[in-house]
């Protein structure tokens, strides 16, 4: 069966934004216009198609990235748009990270009243990291206080982007009734509520001057990115609509310009034009560089390791990346994956090259937020889901067994907040482990472990809301009732000076003994670098087959530090010497020797406790500014900057997480409910001695 839609006519896009900018509503409208849903879903009524988990419908926020396929016709040509709806709440950054990794382009939605909000900056930086070309949609133009040009200026100033308005609103707030398309230079007026009927009119006199100025600026910005157009422009030639679109498409894909559109998704205004813009300006899988990877067992960046590329074509060997695991009540485990090259049929085998496991492809599904369609094969550029994978997890590469490749995995931030959880009854005990296991499979930023000292089950995540949603899902989906402790800060340990150790594990008293001997150098890394292991063994003083055991022993010892039993981070461990015994050496012996060695090195390395620091943004009316600033200082925070936004003040500060529990409630009562705040993890920093002492005493009881 040949592919239905040629590659050039596929768009893989994500709709990304700050919470409440109207992202899910925009996606709903897209599904409505592309004929995938016949009744409009409303987030505030709790019927949105994309928000299919119960908690999402209740909270009116999006938690999981649902992937949906839609069709859209532009100028008589049908296109396929695969849409990934992503959450905008900071606690769910992992969802955004993994979506961006497999997208080709993004639609960033802004609220015309609030403009660029803190989470918009985070998402924008994430998109920069993966070089995702994007277009902007300034939504909620019908709300009181909506201001299109202010939002465009904020995109320029706060995000450091080069926004180019390709539309201009006619009217704002309740008088918002249409847009001027600056590319074609025509006014589009919406006649009915559904936004399905449009009429072209002459450009209204009250916006004519502004439109002319913006159109000239737009043409100049587009012409600057293309030498041929620059010449025509300088010679005073009129550039055609096709020339402008072609050059703007190229500049958008290269990340030089960002087209900006506007509308009001809830009123169905501007969404069809947004779909047209997705087709005109965002890349197809063919427009982006081919993916690169290494052969299994090799590490990118090591000496002598050559990178393999996979062109986006069906004739190349099959390569895909799993970007999301979901436990589905009807079909069990689903793995969403993006196909980068080749094609895949049901019934065939693939190699999971990340884990070196074969996986049989039973059924393939194409997803429409919560209704699914069975398909027989998928091709390069597609996004699909496979049913019941045995071995595959988020970030794994799946590929042709005869031509293996490992793509770069997806890196997720470490959890910063944890709480103890215990089942209410004996019956819940067994179900708890199953539920937590499945939830951890789905969400890489959610961790479950047992506290070695108290024996309690600890769950850790990115924020209070994140853990709240997890506990909620346990109750609803897995029917597990559990009591939860107070949220605790996830401290870490590290070292401040390098340390050298010589560690031996020897048991030789008759029969087969044990012998492992390693010399390790352990050095501090800069904050946020995690862990690095270097094998510096030369001349075979330790045989190669024991090296992985040494690394495993080091990692095991890092799980619980020497000061207060918190995980050890930001260290580089070099195995530079050691010895072995022909008969008595084993993997186990080397693992134990390495484990003991690391503990000793951390003791020698002047260990310290690290605490997570949050980046906090507070929007408060002027009258409460003094009180809010005083409060931040009392929480050991430091203010980084302030700016006026409308008649409110925006404070940006860094505050340790330990002093931020319940902050939203305190802030509300201090400001009569008029201030709002948002926070996200920023970095780990050393804990002041007096506080460290307190924590150590508490842990040691």
Curated annotation (Swiss-Prot):
Q: Which Gene3D superfamilies match?
A: 3.30.230.10, 3.30.70.240, Elongation Factor G (Translational Gtpase), domain 3, P-loop containing nucleotide triphosphate hydrolases, Translation factors
Q: What Pfam families does the entry give?
A: EF-G_D2 (PF22042), EFG_C (PF00679), EFG_III (PF14492), EFG_IV (PF03764), GTP_EFTU (PF00009)
Q: Which GO terms describe its biological process?
A: ribosome disassembly
GO terms for MF:
GTP binding; GTPase activity; translation elongation factor activity
Does the record carry Iron as a key word? no
Q: Where are the transmembrane segments?
A: none
Instruction: From the Swiss-Prot or TrEMBL record, state where the protein is found.
Output: Cytoplasm
Q: Which residues form the tr-type G domain?
A: 8-286
Domain of life of the native organism: Bacteria
CDD domains, from UniProt?
EF-G, EFG_III, EFG_mtEFG1_IV, EFG_mtEFG_C, EFG_mtEFG_II
Q: Which residues take part in binding GTP?
A: 17-24, 85-89, 139-142
Which keywords describe this protein according to UniProt? Cytoplasm, Elongation factor, GTP-binding, Nucleotide-binding, Protein biosynthesis
Listed under GO cellular component are: cytoplasm
Task: Supply the PANTHER family for this chain.
Answer: RIBOSOME-RELEASING FACTOR 2, MITOCHONDRIAL, TRANSLATION ELONGATION FACTOR G-RELATED
NCBIfam families for the chain: EF-G, PRK12740.1-3, PRK12740.1-5, PRK13351.1-1, small_GTP
What is the role of the protein in this entry?
Catalyzes the GTP-dependent ribosomal translocation step during translation elongation. During this step, the ribosome changes from the pre-translocational (PRE) to the post-translocational (POST) state as the newly formed A-site-bound peptidyl-tRNA and P-site-bound deacylated tRNA move to the P and E sites, respectively. Catalyzes the coordinated movement of the two tRNA molecules, the mRNA and conformational changes in the ribosome.
Similarity field: Belongs to the TRAFAC class translation factor GTPase superfamily. Classic translation factor GTPase family. EF-G/EF-2 subfamily.
Q: What is this protein called?
A: Elongation factor G
Specify the species: Roseiflexus castenholzii (strain DSM 13941 / HLO8)
Write the lineage as a comma-separated list.
Bacteria, Bacillati, Chloroflexota, Chloroflexia, Chloroflexales
Q: Which gene encodes it?
A: fusA
């Amino acid at each position: 069966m040949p592919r239905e839609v040629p590659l050039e006519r596929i768009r893989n896009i994500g709709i990304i934004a700050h919470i409440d900018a109207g992202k899910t509503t925009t996606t709903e409208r897209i599904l409505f216009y592309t004929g995938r849903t016949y009744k409009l879903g409303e987030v505030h009524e709790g019927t949105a198609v994309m928000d299919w988990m119960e908690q999402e419908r209740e909270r009116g926020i999006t938690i999981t990235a649902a992937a949906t396929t839609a069709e859209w016709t532009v100028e008589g040509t049908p296109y396929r748009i695969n849409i990934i709806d992503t959450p905008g709440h900071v606690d769910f950054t992992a969802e955004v990270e993994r979506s961006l990794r497999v997208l080709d382009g993004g639609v960033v939605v802004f609220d015309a009243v609030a403009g660029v909000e803190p989470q918009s900056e985070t998402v924008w930086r994430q998109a920069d990291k993966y070089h995702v070309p994007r277009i902007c949609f300034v939504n909620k133009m019908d709300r009181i206080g909506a201001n299109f040009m202010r939002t465009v200026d904020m995109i320029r100033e706060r995000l450091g982007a080069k926004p180019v308005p390709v539309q201009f609103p006619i009217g704002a707030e309740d008088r918002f009734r249409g847009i001027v398309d600056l590319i074609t230079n025509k006014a589009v007026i919406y006649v009915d509520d559904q936004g399905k009927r449009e009429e072209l009119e002459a450009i209204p006199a009250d916006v004519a001057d502004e439109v002319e100025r913006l159109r000239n600026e737009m043409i100049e910005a587009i012409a600057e990115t293309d030498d041929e157009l620059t010449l025509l422009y300088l010679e005073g030639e009129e550039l055609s609509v096709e020339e402008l679109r072609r050059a703007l498409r190229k500049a958008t894909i290269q990340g030089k310009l960002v087209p900006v559109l506007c509308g009001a998704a809830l009123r169905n205004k501007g969404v069809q034009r947004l779909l047209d813009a997705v087709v005109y300006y965002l890349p197809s899988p063919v427009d982006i560089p081919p993916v690169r990877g290494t052969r299994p067992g090799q590490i990118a960046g090591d000496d002598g390791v050559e990178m393999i590329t996979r062109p986006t074509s069906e004739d190349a060997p099959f390569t895909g990346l799993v970007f999301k695991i979901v436990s589905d009540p009807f079909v069990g485990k689903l793995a969403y994956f993006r196909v980068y090259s080749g094609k895949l049929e049901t019934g065939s085998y693939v190699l999971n090259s990340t884990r070196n496991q074969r996986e049989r492809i039973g059924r393939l599904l194409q997803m429409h937020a919560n209704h699914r369609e069975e398909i027989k094969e998928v091709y390069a550029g597609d996004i699909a889901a496979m049913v019941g994978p045995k071995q595959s997890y988020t970030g794994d590469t799946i590929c042709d067994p005869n031509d293996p490749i490992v793509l770069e995995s997806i890196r997720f931030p470490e959890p910063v907040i944890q709480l103890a959880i215990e089942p209410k009854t004996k019956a819940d005990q067994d179900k708890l482990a199953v539920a937590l296991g499945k939830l951890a499979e789905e969400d890489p930023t959610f961790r479950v472990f047992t506290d070695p000292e108290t024996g309690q089950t600890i769950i850790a995540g990115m924020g209070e809301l994140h853990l709240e949603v997890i506990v909620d899902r346990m109750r609803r989906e897995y029917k597990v009732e559990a009591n939860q402790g107070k949220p605790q800060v996830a401290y870490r340990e590290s070292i401040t000076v390098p340390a050298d150790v010589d560690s031996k594990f020897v048991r030789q008293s008759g029969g087969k003994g044990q012998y492992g001997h390693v010399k390790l150098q352990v050095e501090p890394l800069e904050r946020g670098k995690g862990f690095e292991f270097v094998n510096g063994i030369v001349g075979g003083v330790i045989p190669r087959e024991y090296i992985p055991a040494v690394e495993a022993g080091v990692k095991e010892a890092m799980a619980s530090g020497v000061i207060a039993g918190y995980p050890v981070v930001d260290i580089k461990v070099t195995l530079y010497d050691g010895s072995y015994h022909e008969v008595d050496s084993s993997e186990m012996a080397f693992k134990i020797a390495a484990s003991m060695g690391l503990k000793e090195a951390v003791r020698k390395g002047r260990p310290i406790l690290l605490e997570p620091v949050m980046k906090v943004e507070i929007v408060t009316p002027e009258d409460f500014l003094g009180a809010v600033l005083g409060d931040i200082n009392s929480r050991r925070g430091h203010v980084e900057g302030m700016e006026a936004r409308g008649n409110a003040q925006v404070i940006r500060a860094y505050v340790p997480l330990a002093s931020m529990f319940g902050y939203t409630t305190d802030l509300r009562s201090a400001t009569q409910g008029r201030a709002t705040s948002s926070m996200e993890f920023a970095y780990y920093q050393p804990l002041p001695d007096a506080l460290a002492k307190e924590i150590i005493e508490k842990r040691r009881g």
